[in-house]
A protein has these predicted regions:
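C-terminal motif of bacterial Sec signal peptides marking the signal peptidase cleavage site
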Residues: 15-18
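A residue-level detector for conformationally permissive "hinge/kink" positions
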Residues: 10-12, 171
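Glycan-processing catalytic domains of CAZymes
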Residues: 22-258
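Bacterial N-terminal signal peptides that target proteins for export
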Residues: 1-8
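Residue-level signal for mature regions of secreted extracellular proteins and peptides
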Residues: 12-13, 251
Length: 258
């Protein structure tokens, strides 16, 4: 992830690949480095920004919203929170209470016990089914670095790797590309599993070079800064081939790209 085995094993590998349910990599959208993008998570999308990629909330937007963006030639990423329970989502009752941990600093959100793969997998499968059925091209799974936070659970880096790989496989089984959100320490292990990266504030913390493995693999890095002005990070972003812009924290329509 060969003697008589040189003949038998390749055939067996092809047969198993055909039964796995995972879409071939070449059939998925693969965003390349440097693509401009819009990231809007506050309510339904405003389609007026002229960029090739939109990252929008999977619950708040409709089939018609995604179809309109496609008619305009856009690719569309489905934002889904996979690391925290949200009390404002229609499937909030699907999460067993023992899986809900500490509040994460955002209103109505609590960390999830991501060790419970068998419980969380069908919930996330239904969410990614929604993304696929609405016509999205990719998924942005949020909060995939709980092991570095006070979640209320003794999460380890190994727990996070297992969960993140499960999330990536759920997306790929549905023909969706998937992005690694932040989680810089695990890029070396997770690079083969993810099709692009989404990063917040790597310039503020002088960490943008850590995303270079994605760029070197021909995979886009969609990057935002909140507090830093473009004058402080765009030169490095262009050098590193990041898709960078400044946004306000509420992630509305406003953007200031490099």
């Amino acid at each position: 992830m060969r003697n008589t085995a040189r003949v038998i094993l390749p055939a067996l590998t092809l047969a198993l690949a055909g039964c796995s349910g995972t879409e071939p990599e070449e059939s998925r959208w693969q965003p390349h480095p440097g693509l401009a993008w819009q990231w809007q998570l506050d309510t339904r999308v405003d389609p007026s920004v002229d960029v090739p990629v939109y990252d929008i909330d999977g619950f708040e937007n409709t089939v018609a919203d995604v179809a309109r963006l496609h008619r305009d030639g856009r690719k569309v990423i489905c934002y889904i929170n996979v690391g925290a329970w949200e009390n404002f989502r229609p499937d909030k009752a699907d999460f067993p209470r023992p899986l809900l941990g500490e509040q994460n600093g955002w209103a109505g959100e609590r960390w999830l016990d991501i060790r419970e793969l068998t419980v969380l997998r069908p919930i996330m499968e239904r969410r990614f089914d929604m993304c696929r059925d609405k016509g999205f091209d990719a998924v942005e799974p949020d909060l995939v670095e709980g092991y570095g936070n006070d979640t209320g659970f003794p999460l380890t880096p190994r727990d996070q790797l297992r969960y993140n790989r499960m999330i990536a496989s759920i997306a790929h089984e549905r023909g969706l590309s998937v992005g690694l959100k932040n989680d810089l320490p695990q890029i070396p292990q997770l690079l083969p599993d993810f099709d692009f990266a989404v990063n917040e504030e790597c310039a503020q913390y002088d960490e943008c070079a850590r995303l270079s493995p994605f760029i070197a693999s021909g995979k886009a890095v969609f990057h935002v800064e909140y507090a830093e002005p473009t004058s402080r990070f765009c030169a490095e972003s262009r050098k590193l081939k990041l898709s960078s812009m400044q946004k306000r924290l509420e992630l509305g329509v406003w953007r200031k790209p490099c």
